[in-house]
Regions:
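Glycan-processing catalytic domains of CAZymes
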Residues: 1-142
Length: 142
């Protein structure tokens, strides 16, 4: 199992590198920002090829929506993600929270880590500007 896991990591890193190389040939300046898979950040060659990372549910919602995650899990993920901020690359964190006070606490905490927070609903069917949903422009198009 350990060998398979190591091989899966190596294959995924090689896959992301191949995508990045091909995309940047076709479109110089193409950005590669994977979602989750922060365990791969331990590999310096992987960090070198990506331009940032997106991370969902860092503080809340791993097991139960809008409930705090296990502190050990948070620390482990933050340590990995900080490898990327140490390389001066952004970490975008998406938390699925509704309560304004929880959003504000999470925002302050994520910014202290040097991460860029974003808050929305899990269905991803609306955008938020700050702590409020963005206006619905569908009515404008009628």
């Amino acid at each position: 199992m350990v060998k398979e896991k190591r091989n899966a990591r190596a294959l995924m890193i090689a896959f992301v590198k191949a995508i990045a190389e091909r995309a940047r040939v076709l479109k110089p300046g193409f950005l590669v920002v994977p979602q989750n898979a922060e365990a791969l950040l331990a590999d310096a060659s992987y960090r070198a090829v990506i331009d940032g990372i997106g991370k969902e549910d860092l503080l809340f919602g791993d097991d139960v929506s809008q409930q705090p995650n296990d502190p050990k899990s948070i620390v482990s993920d933050v340590v990995r993600l900080k490898l990327l901020t140490a390389d001066h690359k952004p970490v975008f964190v998406v938390e699925y929270l509704d309560a304004p006070q929880e959003i504000e606490r999470a925002r302050r905490r994520l910014e202290r880590y040097g991460f860029i927070p974003y808050f929305t609903d899990r269905a991803l069917d609306s955008m938020r500007i700050g702590d409020v949903p963005a206006p619905d422009h569908a009515a404008d198009k009628k």
